[in-house]
């Protein structure tokens, strides 16, 4: 199989947070082209009614798979994958889906205090999937679920170069910090792919040091394990396409995409 015959990897997110996963995946799969898809017409996912969001994502993937025929799809969105991942695998059994789920298992393995917080969207927090992960892997820990209504939007704005106020960020992360019987939270799981972009702000404003757990590298490693590596490949150069379901990303977003080696594709609205 020559490099021109290699199918691309599709990376999907509700917005631009999935760029954290794309960045890691490119390091591990330099022989592949990537297609980045941002469902900005539906962003943010956290406030959607579950049935409507499930219907939207399944229909959207029907169009994406038909048009792009990727090798695999990486769902770089906790809210989407915890809701619709199983359904995507049933509806499109010919496709491999690699999902993003809260990194509760590694957090439970690493914590010393036994106090772990999961910083997510409201949608991810209320999923049975998330609670099943806690029951399976962190039953001996005190796990606090923090569903932020605002942080994904704030992170998108920050990535685009807009300023955030310390007080606004501090209010969003404050519930993550718990003290019980002289012990303190020592790990916060970043259960939204937007949040790692703001992790340095979190570190600066945290009331005490914690380990902010970013799952992007683990997701990329999982994807790499499922993608065949051809013999004699050469790393690819050039821009990959970025697709926005609104069909109209603003100038700041286009500039950001360029910084990630992506070129916004000229497509009509998909959403």
Swiss-Prot record:
The keyword Isomerase applies. GO terms for biological process: cell wall organization; peptidoglycan biosynthetic process; regulation of cell shape. Pfam families: Asp_Glu_race (PF01177). Its EC number is 5.1.1.3. Substrate binds at residues 13-14, 45-46, 78-79, 193-194. It is an enzyme of class 5 (isomerase). Gene3D superfamilies: 3.40.50.1860. One of its GO terms (molecular function) is glutamate racemase activity. The active site is at 77 (proton donor/acceptor), 192 (proton donor/acceptor). Pathway: Cell wall biogenesis; peptidoglycan biosynthesis. SUPFAM superfamilies: Aspartate/glutamate racemase (SSF53681). Keywords: Cell shape, Cell wall biogenesis/degradation, Isomerase, Peptidoglycan synthesis. PROSITE patterns: ASP_GLU_RACEMASE_2. It catalyses: L-glutamate = D-glutamate. The keyword Transport does not apply. NCBIfam families: glut_race (TIGR00067). Provides the (R)-glutamate required for cell wall biosynthesis. Belongs to the aspartate/glutamate racemases family. This is Glutamate racemase. It comes from Sinorhizobium medicae (strain WSM419).
